[in-house]
Amino acid sequence: MFKIIKCNQINNKLINKKIEINGWVKKIRNHGKVTFINIRDRYDEAQILVSDEKLLKITSQIKMEYCIKIQGKLNLRPLELVNREMKTGELEIIAENIDIISKCNELPFMIENNNNASDNSKLEYRYLDLRREEQKQKIILRSKVIHIIRNHLTKQDFLELETPTFVKSTPEGARDFLVPSRIHKGHFYALPQSPQIYKQLAMIAGLDKYFQIARCYRDEDSRGDRQPEFTQLDLEMSFIKKENIFKLIENLIFTIFKNSLNITLPKKFKKITYKDAMNIYGSDKPDTRYELLIQDMSKALKQSPFDVFKDTLQNKGTIKALIIKNQAHNFSRSKINSLEEHAKLYKARTLYFTKIENNEFTGGIAKFINPIKKTLIETYSLKNNDLIFFIADLWETACKAIGQIRIKIATELNLINKNIFEFLWIYDFPLFEYDEDTQSYKAAHHMFSMPQAKYINTLESNPSEVLGEVYDLVLNGTELGSGSIRVHTKELQQRIFNIVGFNDKIAEERFGFFLKALEYGAPIHGGIAIGIDRLLMLMTNSNSIKDVILFPKNSFAASPLDKSPSKISNEQLKELNLTIENNKN
């Protein structure tokens, strides 16, 4: 009788015992009268020694990635043949029976080394890509992290609730994925971009602690590393302040990292206001793993004879600068030109520079800086071989553009420590932002966020100045989560709808059911959503969120694996009362 075990269960206690393992052929080496097979399962790998003549005939048919069953006796390897790179490297199974469970076609790429395979090929054969140890461990870690989340929150009396997947389309932000109704012809469901309204309804219902591992869907244009469907930890609590959310999430993430990666994080994360983040780092999701802080030189350069600086300051703009210490020799003119073009991508008019040699400013706009060199050198402790970049523009443009230069320079100078995790809370966000294209206000985060108390009575007088009870969690320069304290009265919610251009009729059409609920004793409540895909990407130091999703889409929101999206039959269209227009243009 053979004992069925997994590869990681092989140990010295089973020596001379009859065992059975099942798995995939990772490696096969034919040495004439002896063949060695390395078999892999989810847990580990093991070496099989085959010397029986009948079995050698079977092994001659076996190729890489065949799925096989091995029965045999566990032996110690000879000392000179011990493989220290394998956990089971001191042991091997002497094969007594071999069954080929299923064959494997010629591989589209090598499993153990598929660096030359295209992304589309790896997605088309994702089930093969997942046999790689690195990829497999990322998916296993994902499962572990989700288990830790559930366990941690359940212990704190959170209820795991499931909000609807078919919801009312309430267009705002990204486009909805729409699902036609067969029963209600001409009507459509939307797939949720987030469970936002429904988790708020759960708070109104009195279910005061909610969480969900939520699937979310956004029909966004192809860009970068976006996925049309993604997973987030969504949670909400009643009768709280933002500090309660901060503490909850800090404890949760501390537990996740400790129990999954054995990494001990600080129990409290740093906090910074949105305005300070923009001024110091040039970003509302700053990477704080390196210094390279932005300087506001508006006051210091007020006396500069440079007309651009004068005009900028007269028009209520600002001058932001980056001081690159002792690195001027590493920046050629072509590299500086490249940085200038990079700044223009972020709406900056241009990027100015100068450097210090022999205690004089030289190059770039040096002639406009030398008249005030003493002030600048003393104020900013400048030294020879220092390089300074300037952007003069309106505040937001100057901050964002110099912030992007900061990131690019830090990357080129290898200043980023990729082995640390820097969490950061950003708070005091503007509640509204002005859209120059539409000449109207829109919600900076979303329309259900609470204004700070001091702005409520004067909300409409200057929406640009209103700060919200809004907060983001940032990890290593990536926005990991976003949340807020929510509006809990119908009157205030309608005022916010009006500011963002939803008159009472539109608000009633889109959100009438929610406004009605706010009239039935809504509690103070707030929450946050944490991107699980992004969290796992950063935890595993992956280049893409595709690496941590079981079956991801490509950059065009399509699946090479199952060829979705796909056309449907005329019969299906007819059932849904739909027709497809052929646009010959």
UniProtKB/Swiss-Prot annotation:
Enzyme Commission identifier(s)? 6.1.1.23
Q: Record's Gene3D superfamilies? A: Bira Bifunctional Protein, Domain 2, GAD-like domain, Nucleic acid-binding proteins
One GO molecular function term of this record is: nucleic acid binding
Please list the coiled coil stretches: none
Q: Name one GO biological process term.
A: aspartyl-tRNA aminoacylation
Q: What is this protein called?
A: Aspartate--tRNA(Asp/Asn) ligase
Record's keyword terms, sorted: Aminoacyl-tRNA synthetase, ATP-binding, Cytoplasm, Ligase, Nucleotide-binding, Protein biosynthesis
- Which residues hold ATP? 218-220, 227, 479, 531-534
- Does the record's keyword annotation contain Repressor? no
**What domain of life is recorded for the organism?**
Bacteria
Source species of the chain: Borrelia duttonii (strain Ly)
Its taxonomic path starts at:
Bacteria, Pseudomonadati, Spirochaetota, Spirochaetia, Spirochaetales
Q: Where is this region: Aspartate?
A: 196-199
- Pfam families from the xrefs? GAD (PF02938), tRNA-synt_2 (PF00152), tRNA_anti-codon (PF01336)
Q: What does this protein do?
A: Aspartyl-tRNA synthetase with relaxed tRNA specificity since it is able to aspartylate not only its cognate tRNA(Asp) but also tRNA(Asn). Reaction proceeds in two steps: L-aspartate is first activated by ATP to form Asp-AMP and then transferred to the acceptor end of tRNA(Asp/Asn).
**Where in the chain is the site Important for tRNA non-discrimination?**
31
List, alphabetically, the GO terms of the cellular component aspect. Answer: cytoplasm
What subcellular locations does the record give? Cytoplasm
Show the catalytic activity: tRNA(Asx) + L-aspartate + ATP = L-aspartyl-tRNA(Asx) + AMP + diphosphate
